[in-house]
Amino acid sequence: MNSPIQPNTSRSDEEDFSADYPRHKHPAIRVVMMPRDTNALGTIFGGVILSEIDLAAAIEAHRYHSGRIATVAMDTIEFKRPVFVGDLVSFFTETTRVGTTSVTVKVSVWAQRRFGSHVRVPVTEASVTMVAVGEDGQKVPLERREPVDID
């Protein structure tokens, strides 16, 4: 019997996704999930994943604005598969819209299963809208319409 924190990595439905892993892209964030991140079921708490999605979207949005950035919406969030303790989770970002004051970012979350396998599976996808704000917390125009590298 499988423990909730030790995934059955021999499942064929997970093995099929490794070919789709975005190898050509560099993740905004990579995190190993720890026991402190679990929910009552023993899998990773969705709020932990949402927090990292928010950070990844902010990193992408800062390519358009070096000042303050605030999250205004998480429009779409789809939890596709559970994340387990020990999974190496990668958060990939892609700008989908640049407005006058805001940037919309797609965040694709992948987990590399750590218990005896190199299986990679898509676990979550989200669309996040970030807005540039001034010292007073009000919207301000983005500094640029084209991204810059912030590595």
Go through the PLM ranges and name each one.
Residues 36:
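Catalytic core of tubulin tyrosine ligase-like
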